[in-house]
Amino acid sequence: MKKLNRQQLIDLATQSYFANVDKKDMDAVLANFHDDAVFTIPTDPIVHEGKQGIRAMFENLFGGFEEVWHGDFECTADEESQTVSARFNVYLKTADGTEVRLSNCNFWYVEDGKFSRVFVFMSG
C-alpha cells in the first residue's frame, strides 16, 4: 500500500483536490477519490457515497456558483494514520453576483494515495 509523507498528504488536499475544485475540473477532482469513497457533511447533514454520489455533489457546486475559491489553509497531517485536516476559507459567487464566505474544516482519510473518507464541517 502506498503511503504518503506529510507534505504529500497536504499537497493531495490543497493542490490536487482543492486547486482542481477551484478550476471546476471534475475529472481531476474525482481522481483523488477511491471508487467507494464516502463524503460526509455532518453540518448539513448529508452523505455522498461513491464517485457517482460525489460527482453529483460537485455538479451542484459547479453549476450553482460562477466563482469557487478555497485558501488560507492551516493544515495538519499524520503520516502514520494517513490523515490530513485543514481549516480554510471559502469564497463563492453566484451568477447574479451574490457572494458567500465560509470558514470550513475538512478531515481526509487516505488509503493508497487517494481519499477513502472525507468529512466537511461548514460554517454556514
Spans of model-derived segments:
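Short, low-complexity N-terminal intrinsically disordered segments enriched in polar/charged residues
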Residues: M1-N32
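A solvent-exposed, acidic/Ser-Thr-rich amphipathic alpha-helical stretch
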Residues: M26-E79
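Short beta-strand segments enriched in hydrophobic/aromatic residues
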Residues: F33, F88-L92, N106, F121-M122
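Structural motif
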Residues: D36-V38, T83, F107, K114
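Short, surface-exposed coil-to-beta transition loops
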Residues: W69-H70, S85-R87, V100-N106
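A short hydrophobic beta-strand element
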Residues: E79-V90
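Short, cysteine-centered beta-strand-loop-beta hairpins and adjacent loop/turn segments enriched
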Residues: Y91-R101
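Short beta-strand edge/turn micro-motifs at domain boundaries
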Residues: R101-G124
